[in-house]
Amino acid sequence: MAKSIPRISSRRNGRIGSGNNVRRIPKGVIHVQASFHNTIVTVTDVRGRVVSWSSAGTSGFKGTRRGTPFAAQTAATNAIRTVVDQGMLRAEVLIKGPGLGRDAALRAIRRSGILLTFVRDLTPMPHNGCRPPKQRRV
């Protein structure tokens, strides 16, 4: 007789870390990845385990509106809302990417009430590495 395979819940059913096993997180790391087309905000604990995340796409913005500063602000607010409920007091902010949502996401994080220990820019900059692609002619 065939074994029944337990159903694995999808991400839409609930956030990771939600439910009965909510742990207190006094200090965390907020990663903001801002590209020209989207902004992804991930909140981890100090060891790097993901507690909550959100992006402009999951916040309801589609198409070109995902790259706007308002979409980045909404994504940052959605990602931080769950960790504030879990008791996060202090956080480090690591920002990566050249997108428009960098400043808007940082402004939303500052308004959330979490004390920021430092803000670091980790945007990758080539030291004359690979040749960039040719310029577009429109």
Curated annotation (Swiss-Prot):
Keywords (A to Z) from UniProt: Plastid, Ribonucleoprotein, Ribosomal protein, RNA-binding, rRNA-binding
PROSITE patterns (alphabetical): RIBOSOMAL_S11
Keyword NAD: no
Organism in which the protein naturally occurs: Cuscuta reflexa
GO terms of biological process kind: translation
Protein name: Small ribosomal subunit protein uS11c
MF (Gene Ontology): rRNA binding; structural constituent of ribosome
SUPFAM superfamilies (alphabetical): Translational machinery components
Intracellular or extracellular location(s): Plastid
Record family assignment: Belongs to the universal ribosomal protein uS11 family.
Gene3D superfamilies: Ribosomal protein S11
Region (Disordered): 1-22
Pfam family, one: Ribosomal_S11
Quaternary assembly: Part of the 30S ribosomal subunit.
GO annotations of cellular component type: plastid; ribonucleoprotein complex; ribosome
